[in-house]
Structure formats: C-alpha cells, structure tokens
Amino acid sequence: MMNLVPANVTHLDSVVQLEKATFPDDAISKRSFRRFIESNTADFFVMLNDKRVVGYYVVLFRNNTNLARLYALVLSPQFRGKGLGKQLLQHAEDRADLRHSLFLRTEVATSNQIAQQLFINAGFRAVELREAYFPPSTSQSQDALILQKLLPRYELGEDNSVGATERYVPMMTQSTEFTCGPASLLMALDYFGRPTADASQEELEIWREATTIYMTSGHGGCGPHGLARAAFKRGLSVRVAVNTDDALFIDSVRQEQKKEVMQRIQQADIDYLHRHGVTIDVCDYGVAELKADLGAGKLILALISTYHFDGVRAPHWVLICAADDDFIYINDPDYDTLPWESPTERQYLPIPIATFNKAFGFGGRKQKAAVIVGRVD
C-alpha cells in the first residue's frame, strides 16, 4: 500500500540513491535534502511502498510571494505507469494550495516528454523556454521548459464562500483597450439572464453611453455612474458606491476644457440615476460590504488600479463574482493577456484579499468606485 508522509532523516539514504539513479549528472545532494526536512519554507514528502521509498517531491516557498516552486518530483522506474506520478503531483499541488500559493511552477528538460505530458495533463502551461538551464548531462537536455499552474479554483457551493451560486458567471474578453467596463457589465447581464445577441456591438454601444469622453491618452474609459445608467436601462437593479462626490478621472487630464467636459458628462449620468431612484452611496465600500452584496445574490463591477498586477498605473474595470476567507474572485476582461494565458484563466481569477485592498481604487486620491448589480425584485 502506498503512503505519502513527510520526509525524515531515516529516508535520506533511499532518497539520495533514487535521486542519483534518476539524475546521475545533476543530483540533489544529501545535505540539501536534509535542509529541506528542516526548512519551514519547504514541503518534502516521500511515497512509501510499505516502508520502502519509491518516490518523493520537494516544493519550495518564498516568503511574501504567492509563487511555489516544485523543485523535485521523482518516482522509481518500476512504479511508473501506475498513476503514482499523478498522485505525487496532486499531493504537491494540495500542499501548495494549503499555503495559499497562487501558482505552482516547475522546470522540465525539453527532452523529458513523459514528465511534460504529466504536467500538461494536470493543467500546467508552458510559460518560458530557458536555454542551457540544466548543467551538461548524458541523461537529459540542458534546455528547460518552465511550466506553471494556477492553483486556487473557485468551486460553487464552497462552505466559506459567498457569490454566484446558481452557475458560474460567464467569461468575456473586451475587444478594445477602452471597453473593460462594458465587457464586465455584459458578463453580469448574461449571468442575470439578459444576454445580448451581438455582444461585440453591444460592448461598443455601452461604451458610447458610459464613456467619460477623455482620459490621459486615447479614448476615455467608463465611469461608474455611466455604467450604472447603462445597467439600469438594460433591466438590472443597480446601486453605486463611491468614496467621493468628485468626478472621477479628472486628475488624469490637464486641460481645463477637458475637465469641464468630463464633469458635465458625469453629472448628467448622476442626474439620470437620481431621477430614476438609483441609490448612490458615498462611502468607504470595502471587502465586508462587497461580501454582503455577493451574499445577497449581487455581482460587483469594481474599479481597480492595474499597478499591483503589471506595474502600470491604469484604471481597469473587473467583475467580482465571489469571495471567501482568502480571495476575491474576479472575471478580468483584459484582452492584453500573456502568450500562455487563455480567457478561462481570467475567469474566477483569485486575488488575495490583501492585494485586492491595495488595488481597489485609482489615482493619487485613491478614488473608489463600485457598481452593484442584480436582478430586479
């Protein structure tokens, strides 16, 4: 019977023997394995057949990051082809998930097709090719394929979660750099049973209705009041939460004429919302409030700064779909994805709550804006 247990010093000789047989030119030393046992930033587990070591893995963690590294995963040749490698890998993923790691990353020699297939079948994606990564070896190529997997996945009905419980909120990618707000609203409309026949055309139509006209450069984005107006016109219940009475994004333009136009267009949206009884709360809307709204069956369009994700200070609308004790789960419509990403990797994207608190808001004055939408009672 196979068991996975934390490694201890009695396992070291067997582990080192298996390591040298697998990587004769680049074996991890016994001293290093001993350090992994003692370290609080490493998980080192062995797979035992009765009391014999037949496999092991090492996952390394770096303080203050959400990235875990699968440093080693080895299975004795005579036990391969029985699903045990998959079992080792799943256990490593579970351990990284317990430490709230967002990503698990590993390196595999380009010549090791079997290992690559194991990881790809488990949901890993190739993110980089590094030439001459491994030392010269007779057993494998020097080039390495860097593989990575997003670990936390939101599951409908999680005990400690709030959010969309009927079905997953569908994903949509914005078609232009300035329509993140409309794309977020279209996802909410679809979830609440009001999909559009031509999403790409409706995306632009919503932008025309909700745009602030100007931004620092290029086309203007969308303000919360304009998005709320568009959502109300399309049959959703709407509430706006902002932390200021001032017009948003004014600081992003310098010309007084542009500032005046932006103020006028936003005031027109505010007046429309007031005439139709839409609530505009001026408050410090935060995680506690958004969890309460998610628990009430709402979805939230939230304005974030992308600085904490890509180093660029830009306003960006996302759709908050769910939350639990550790993460805020968003559908991110951003179309500027990395080459290895697919749209599904931006669906229910887990953002650590501490990171979300930093990102929620835009500009030097940390202007917060949220549009809370739901079905009409």
Task: Show where each model-derived region lies.
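Conserved acetyl-CoA-binding loop-helix of GNAT-fold acetyltransferases
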Residues: 75, 81-94, 113-121
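Active-site-adjacent substructure of cysteine-protease-like catalytic cores
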Residues: 250, 255-332
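Conserved catalytic-core motifs of GNAT/GCN5-like acyltransferases
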Residues: 107-108, 120, 125-146
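Conserved N-terminal entry element of GNAT/NAT acetyltransferase domains
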Residues: 1-10, 145, 152-157
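Conserved GNAT acetyl-CoA-binding A-motif
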Residues: 96-108
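Active-site-adjacent structural segments surrounding the nucleophilic cysteine of cysteine proteases
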Residues: 150-258, 267, 283-284
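Acetyl-CoA-dependent GNAT
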Residues: 6-78, 89-91, 95, 99, ...
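Noncatalytic regulatory segments and standalone regulatory/sensor domains
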Residues: 115, 161, 295, 299, ...
